[in-house]
Amino acid sequence: MRMRNHFLTAVGLAALSVGLALPAIAEVTEQDILNDAKTTDDVVTYGLGPQAQRFSPIKTLNRDNIKGLVPAWSFSFGGEKQRGQESQALVKDGVLYVTGSYSRLYAVDARTGEKKWEYNARLPEGILPCCDVVNRGAALYKDKVYFGTLDAKLVALDQKTGKVVWRKDIDDFKSGYSYTAAPMIVKGKIITGVSGGEFGVVGRVEARDAETGEVVWKRPVIEGHMGELNGKPSTMTGKANESWPGDTWKFGGGATWLGGTYDPELNLIYFGTGNPGPWNSALRPGDNKWSASRLAINPDNGEIVWGFQTTPHDGWDYDGVNEFVPFDMQKDGKTVKAGATADRNGFFYVLDRTNGAFLSATPFVSNINWAKGIDENGRPIYDDANRPGDPAKSEDGKKGKSVYATPGFLGGKNWNPIAYSPDTRLFYVPSNEWGMDIWNEPVNYKKGAAYLGAGFTIKPTFEDHIGSLKAIDPATKKVVWEYKNKAPLWAGVLTTAGNLVFTGTPEGFLKAFDAKTGEEVWKFQVGTGVVASPITWEQDGEQWIGVAAGWGGAVPLWGGEVAKTTAGINQGGSFWAFRLPKALASR
């Protein structure tokens, strides 16, 4: 945590919302949200649809004409505030909404890049973001735009003016809570989680009335905690002490820091849950449910419908928060309502999304050694020789046995979202090849202090690359193609009906690949690392591509030896928009 304090002191400017008036904007409806994966003029959800497949049906741009894709404009986030820019933008009626580091939100003319308005949150001293001062995006609904802030607040703004409509506390930032994800809109409710898993917080998913900001329900994800519905206690999550000893469940982690997906047909929202607290697993024997899990939740009342734990009794910070992407899979001549997730533990899971039944788990990174495999029920077959030792059993009682474990704690895949193409039936997974030395240390919970109980050094697995973009067939469980990158990959992925896959690199490139073969067909240098998720939309009869740029995130803060591969990369803060001119579209 000491690594980050030097830039937190810059926080504390007064909230500011200034800019130009916007023309009339049609309200974003429930139907707009549900149809976002099919429509082309707008992008109104994080993930290009509630299922977050990040697939666009636009096929104007293809490998034959992509050489004509050129920059249209670049918008600077301004000021001295830089750090990581991990936001996915939204577009509605010619206005682009993009969040920036330090809890900022901008409305920009999508044709010209002219700023319409901006909102700068009032961030107090002492905020505790674990992994840089990032924000991953906003949500649109009716006439408002919503986003969360690093001091654990949820803000609703007027889309036209950027003026605050309401501002609500998610939780107490002094206890370690924060918020970095893009909210999700489901049936008139705004769905959020919490960040702060390294500080002994308790993860939860909650729903608020999108008009008023008032809480409708809360669902803690750690066993023993009581849910809430309409202001009253509802049901307990699991059973107290069933998989947590003593009072460890009170500070059990499981932060829901990445946001969720939604299946409207099944009426289920899917959330991943983070690492248990503390990292030192010797202090909490048991499965520690529902940390490091995927949960299906009823959006009407917050009840858990099913849960699947990818790393029970996690001892490596393998988290479990990565997105669960619904898709339909052909198996034995039948269509299976499936969902997939590329877990930080290095396995690519496919589950039945109706009931959480385990279908398959396949390694997607090299040299996994914390587990010997996954059994027929989806449970890891642990290699206990590669679990960090209990410091209480060491000679000095201060440091347990150190082990080398693969993947490293930043994961086979971290936050950066995968994409799925129904055309190729492939998932595109931004992964990293690294391991770590890790050991356990004594720790006690203290409000607002890091609750790790572990030390670590992360190291690259190979000399020639760390980053690896892989195309994975969920039916055959095979890697179809792979692109290797020298530095870690930290950007999200976009795929299109034009047989293209887009992602960014820390070296400053936005790149495009042939979706079937993995051949690199285009790249553009934006001058700083790309760690955001690209989008695409149609405007004036042309296809546009957009991405935020600005190096940062967890790698330079936590990356140890692998951070050396990015040591010379400049920070930045901007949004780049590219277009394929009509005259070049047919070439």
From Swiss-Prot:
Q: What is its EC number?
A: 1.1.2.-, 1.2.2.-
Q: Which GO terms describe its cellular component?
A: membrane; outer membrane-bounded periplasmic space
Q: Where is the composition biased (Basic and acidic residues)?
A: 379-399
Q: Disulphide bridges in this chain?
A: C130-C131
Chief localization: periplasm
Q: Know the name of this protein? A: Lanthanide-dependent ethanol dehydrogenase
State if Metal-binding is listed as a keyword.
yes
Cross-referenced PANTHER family: QUINOPROTEIN ALCOHOL DEHYDROGENASE (CYTOCHROME C) (PTHR32303), QUINOPROTEIN ETHANOL DEHYDROGENASE (PTHR32303:SF20)
